[in-house]
């Protein structure tokens, strides 16, 4: 397996490379949930992320970690929402438009019935640095990306967005525990092939990826990162994507988001 990291433009640079590859199952796209929202967040997306690809397999999902500056006086998510309602100008760092961090922040504003200004960044690293420095009030992103800084005390973790506490951050309560029952949002990861890839090839890839995922899960590789392994058929993956896109599109519409 040759890995070619093609980042940028909300994931569409790598996506375009795969979309225009031969539909033989030899070139695949591995991406986070950001991939399926290109049509919603980009004014001129280079493709339709759902109809121009063949869903192969979903491999895992991980909760988002909500962090605030280490010097912030708030101790939990409820206090953060109350402070935001108190007339303070609260800014949330957004590492990428259409990413789980963006959609989860919209969901938090909805669940908390509060206005939060979205501040876009070019990736998680600069967003995390500004939260650590107290320049931005809140950030949520995959627990994989934020847990290192949280453990080091560079940022203060206040909640995770899963239904249960994460094994890699057992002392951090869920947003549900903090009084926000609808604040459940996971980042997820999947594999796609170009449209037109033969069904038998897609099925073989799905079985192989599920087998590899199960093996990594048994070895503890997923648990160590806070990822929950997912073993699904291609049809289950397609149905999941349809529901996720609908949910995200609704959040963007309610927020008055305009594609850029």
Regions found by a protein language model. Give the residues of each.
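Short, flexible active-site-adjacent loop segments at beta-strand->alpha-helix junctions, enriched
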Residues: 32-34, 72, 96-98, 161-164
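An extracytoplasmic/periplasmic, membrane-proximal ligand-sensing/linker region
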Residues: 110-111, 177, 199-260
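N-terminal (or domain-start) structured segment
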Residues: 1-51, 88-91, 97, 110-142, ...
